[in-house]
Structures are given as structure tokens and as C-alpha cells.
Amino acid sequence: MKKLSFQQIILILQNYWQDYGCAILQPYDAHVGAGTFHPATVLRCLGDKPWFIAYVQPSRRPGDSRYGMHPNRMQHYYQFQVILKPSPDNIQDLYLKSLESLDLDLKTHDIRFVEDDWESPTLGASGLGWEIWCDGMEVSQFTYMQQIGGIECYPVACEITYGLERLALYIQGIDEVKELDWNGQIGEKALKYGEVDFEAERQFSKYNLEFADSEMLLRRFKDSVEQCERLVKVNLPMPAYDECLKASHYFNQLNALGVISVTERASYVLRVRDLARICCIKWLELSSE
């Protein structure tokens, strides 16, 4: 039987969660370190309104730059994010059935929920969570969101994050991400993951580790902090959150360059967390009016 391509995995997950009742959203057009940073998660998990969504999110982690030479670690990758609020009682069964939709036979594979409570210091977010392993490889993260921006989430939302590359490696039986079948075609139409993304991976790795201008990034970080605070004051939490995301990415770039000391790092994390918090507070304030 032909193995699912990378894009087929995404389409099947979209269809599965759409059939459950989720709205399929689009990726957020900003540099984020994980699917959780999408405002559809950060802002919409707050408050008491139901929220059922799913989306793919390209994510960037400058510190994971490896010039495209590492078999499964990249500075740019993809996650599939699901938010179910309020969390249904049968969430574990729903997740396992999503794996079955990807032709994973649960009777022949060792699926384990390994306790791993989740925390994002820069978002002031945390929750009870589990890593989901399939035959010893982590393929997903499962979290009951308890707080975001330091604010308690009620009702509690369930977040499921599929690591698409890891899942595809397992499904296709491949050891290196760049060798993944992207589109399931043969001949001149066939595409591998590496043909789509790895030249960018090489170039952005050089930029992140060698050519990024630290003084410019420091200025941009400061500017984004000031803009975020200013926009919150004029009741614009969504543009303000964009500036928070920019500040977070600039911090990650500075960290990848190695120009931030351990002591300074804690200060930067706290600064970004404070920005996320004021955005969340203002969002809640306006949405309750």
C-alpha cells in the first residue's frame, strides 16, 4: 500500500477535524515559535465562549538552525494545531481515531501517553499535558490549557499539537526529513520535502547564526516592546499582540546568536511575558463588553 505523502497527512487531519465540527483556519502570517502562538489559540482560549478550530502553522526556532544538515531538526517546520474549548470528555478517543484516519493500526503499534506538563514562559502559559509516543517516537503533544498570559482559562481548552514532520517520518518509514515524500506524485511531478524547504533552511541557518545584525535586532526588540505597550493603551490588543510576537522572535534570534547572557535571558523572557499578559488582559476586557 502506498504510504501517505506529507500533504496527504495534512489534508486527512483537516478533513478529520472538520468532520468533528472544527473550523479550519489558516496559518498566522507572522514568525512564531510554535502553533500555540497563533492568536486563535492565545487569545481565543481565554474567556467563556466555545472555540473549536484546527490549522497548520509554519513555525520558526532560530536556535535549531542546522544548515539543513540535521536529519530531523530544522529552524523552520510545520505543526498541526487543534483547539477544543470546552474540552470534550472523549478527547483521547478522538485523538486516537485521528491516528487511525492516517492508516496507523493501533493494535499493532505501541501508543503511549507520557506525562509531560507543558509551559511557555514567554506566553505565561501552562497546562497539564502528555507527549504521545508511537513505538517510542514522539508524534504529538496533548495539553489541557490552564492559563495563558498568567490568566486562568475557564472553561479549560484542550490543545492537540501534531508534529507533522515527525509523524510523516514514522508513517513513511524515513529517517531524514528532507527525504519525505511531499506530494505523492511520481516522475517530473514528484517532490521531496528537501526540494521544497531545504535551500531556505540552509540560507536562514546562515542568517540566524552568522549574519543577523545583533544591534539591529536589539533596536527592533525595543521598538516592538514600545509599540505593543502603546497599542494596548489605545485598545488595539490584536495589533499589539503582533508586536509581542515580533519581540519574541527578535529575542529568539538574539539568543541563537549567543549575544544574550543567562541573566539577560531571564529578563527578556519576563519582558515578552509581560507583553503577552497585557495583550490578553485587554483582549478579555474588550471581548466582555
Swiss-Prot record:
UniProt keyword list: Aminoacyl-tRNA synthetase, ATP-binding, Cytoplasm, Ligase, Nucleotide-binding, Protein biosynthesis
Pfam families named among the record's database cross-references: tRNA-synt_2e
Superkingdom assignment: Bacteria
Catalytic activity reported: tRNA(Gly) + glycine + ATP = glycyl-tRNA(Gly) + AMP + diphosphate
Single GO term (MF): ATP binding
Keyword Aminoacyl-tRNA synthetase included in the entry's annotation: yes
Top class in the EC scheme: ligase
Location, primary (coarse class): cytoplasm
SUPFAM superfamilies reported in the protein's UniProt record: Class II aaRS and biotin synthetases (SSF55681)
InterPro entries hit by this protein: aa-tRNA-synth_II/BPL/LPL (IPR045864), Gly-tRNA-synth_heterodimer (IPR006194), Gly-tRNA_ligase_asu (IPR002310)
GO CC field: cytosol
EC number: 6.1.1.14
Localization annotation: Cytoplasm
A single GO BP: glycyl-tRNA aminoacylation
The family this protein is said to belong to: Belongs to the class-II aminoacyl-tRNA synthetase family.
PANTHER family: GLYCINE--TRNA LIGASE, CHLOROPLASTIC_MITOCHONDRIAL 2, GLYCYL-TRNA SYNTHETASE
Subunit composition and interactions: Tetramer of two alpha and two beta subunits.
NCBIfam families with a match to the protein in the record: glyQ (TIGR00388), PRK09348.1 (NF006827)
UniProt-recorded name of the protein: Glycine--tRNA ligase alpha subunit
Species: Rickettsia prowazekii (strain Madrid E)
